[in-house]
A protein has these predicted regions:
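Signal peptide processing junction and immediate N-terminal pro/mature segment
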Residues: 21-29
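Residue-level preference for the first positions of well-ordered beta-strands
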Residues: 41, 129-133
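Positively charged n-region of N-terminal signal peptides that target proteins for export
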Residues: 1-7
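Long, charged/polar, surface-exposed segments that mediate recognition or autoinhibition
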Residues: 136
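Compositionally biased, intrinsically disordered low-complexity regions
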Residues: 18-22, 182-184
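Active-site-proximal alpha-helix that buttresses catalytic centers in soluble enzyme cores
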Residues: 28-125, 139-154, 159-169, 173-174, ...
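Bacterial N-terminal signal peptides
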Residues: 9-20
Length: 197
């Protein structure tokens, strides 16, 4: 009998914690109905690099600097509350204009710990907007770690203009869109591109 009561009590506690977690990620709309908050994550690869300066850790090229300014113009009105970058000159420089505009200090993450970054974003920034600058081999795995399906199969070495957006809410599948930004983007509007595996 005691084990039955303990099991019931454990289930009630877990259920209560689950409801509390759901309530923490819900907001009340003007009509009085609770709605899930949407977490928005913008992901971009660093802008064009100047490989003639330092092959191991290059700075941005002139075109890359133009793209970094375009990123600032595009995302400053989205009011991000957190910015994430890897610890390279090119990713930091891509994020620098936006960071200055929104007065946020970029947080450095380990590109080998993508899952940990996704967990941190979900836990610490639920219902908010964040920006992540990464690399051609880290963005798609991060989209997957956030629960989405990458809209492209790969990012080639000469592709710098993708702006991925992942929107997540409790109880809903993430919505992933992609658009181009900066000089001569290939995609000009948010385009949901479902990819069949």
């Amino acid at each position: 009998m005691n084990s039955f009561l303990n099991t019931c009590l454990s289930l009630l506690i877990c259920f209560g914690l689950g409801l509390g977690s759901f309530a923490a990620q819900a907001q009340v709309a003007p009509d009085g109905k609770a709605r899930s908050m949407v977490t928005t994550v913008y992901l971009v690869r660093h802008a064009e690099k100047d490989s003639t300066t330092d092959r191991a850790d290059p700075m941005l090229s002139a075109l890359g600097q133009v793209r970094a300014q375009a990123l600032r113009q595009l995302l400053v009105r989205r009011h991000p509350v957190a910015l994430f970058t890897t610890d390279t000159k090119r990713t930091r420089a891509t994020l620098a204009p936006l960071a200055e505009a929104v007065k946020l200090e970029p947080q450095v993450y380990d590109p080998k710990e993508i899952t940990a970054l996704a967990v941190r974003i979900r836990q610490e920034y639920a219902g908010k907007t964040v920006v992540v600058v990464g690399h051609s081999n880290t963005l798609l795995p991060l989209i997957e770690s956030l629960g989405g399906t990458p809209p492209v199969e790969s990012i080639s070495d000469n592709e710098y203009d993708y702006l991925f957006t992942v929107r997540t809410a409790v109880g809903s599948l993430p919505i992933v869109t992609v658009r181009g930004y900066g000089p001569e983007p290939k995609l000009t509007a948010d385009t949901p591109v479902p990819r069949i595996r």
